[in-house]
Swiss-Prot record:
Cross-referenced InterPro entries: C1-like_sf (IPR046349), DC1 (IPR004146), Nucleoredoxin-like (IPR052259), Thioredoxin-like_fold (IPR012336), Thioredoxin-like_sf (IPR036249), Thioredoxin_domain (IPR013766), TryX_NRX_thioredoxin_dom (IPR045870)
Occurrences of domain Thioredoxin (ranges): 17-171, 177-326
Reactions catalysed: [protein]-dithiol + NAD(+) = [protein]-disulfide + NADH + H(+); [protein]-dithiol + NADP(+) = [protein]-disulfide + NADPH + H(+)
Keywords: NAD, Oxidoreductase, Repeat
Organism listed in the record: Arabidopsis thaliana (Mouse-ear cress)
Membership in a protein family: Belongs to the nucleoredoxin family.
Keyword Oxidoreductase attributed: yes
GO MF term set: thioredoxin-disulfide reductase (NADPH) activity
Enzyme Commission number(s) from the entry: 1.8.1.8
Full protein name: Probable nucleoredoxin 3
Known role: Probable thiol-disulfide oxidoreductase that may participate in various redox reactions.
The organism's place on the tree of life at top rank: Eukaryota
Amino acid sequence: MAVSADYQVKFPESGDLYSILAAEGIEFLLSHSGEVPLEYIHGKTICLFFSAIWCRPCKDFTPELIKLYENLQNRGEELEIIFVSFDHDMTSFYEHFWCMPWLAVPFNLSLLNKLRDKYGISRIPSLVPLYSDEISVAEDVIGLIEDYGSEAFPFTKKRKEELKAIDDSKRLGGQLEKLLTHESRNYVVARNGSKVLVSKLVGKTIGLYFGAHWCPPFRSFTSQLVDVYNELATTDKGSFEVILISTDRDSREFNINMTNMPWLAIPYEDRTRQDLCRIFNVKLIPALVIIGPEEKTVTTNAREMVSLYGSRSFPFTESRIVELKACLKKEGDSLPRKVKDNKHEHELKLDMAKAYVCDFCKKQGRFWAFSCNACDYDLHPTCVEEEEALLV
């Protein structure tokens, strides 16, 4: 796609890039094949890339920017990036520039200071577009590229608004395939490596499960979710499916994760993982987002529902939680406040617990229990001998 005239670099008489370079006596830019006259950048879409080899975030971001640049070149975009070095010396400058496929201004501390002041650079890496409607440094072009890759081009406020609207459409639009697939992938994967078409999942309640193996709360919650998943697989005949959205640090951790899970996953190498984290604004893990049978977002806080109510919270709607609370209150109202059971020496009080193990039948329990806090002793209400119950 051709870039419109509004995005072409402009060279007013003073105060712009061209004037600053001329004031320093610089008549050329650098490339790996030699010097490039300044006239070469006329008519091109220009971005200044402020970076340094000593900066870890710069070293992490530069490969991502190279990938974006090469993609845009292959698309025929007239983008030119110019490297402005924050390196400490000439040797470091050339070492850093060596990996870059674009141009650079000559290493010059006086020039660096002028460009830094002109464009308000307070941190690196920074990418500064030089055209109308550009996103400012404060508005974070780097973050936009990390979120959207080459789709962020041409780095304008209008494009940023368009991308946000696309995210909103995917989150609210009620189309599971549009949310989870793209033109190169229409499936999710199982732990045995098999592929499951996303179209086959339409009509089910889908849990998008965000997390990573290195995270202890994630591993703890996974065991709860596995129990819920297996219970619902039996009682609701496959109407619930979970899809892992991995935030693991590498594919090895992802594979370890998958061996402990009975459900599906977005492939680790697929960018959709990052897209979904952004679309649902996932900042903390684990997180569980529910997409209903109508393909619309039901809740972004299903983790709390599962932790509190287990499989009884299915299908994870607010109305179901209201119903559950009313049901549990009714159950509690029908039970005595205290009991004296011959299996334990102390009086037992009615209590609400997320989960416990009954000290008589040794089976797990949820919600109502008769407990002795002094002895950490719990009984299912059904394991209490009713004839000894003392109504209070």
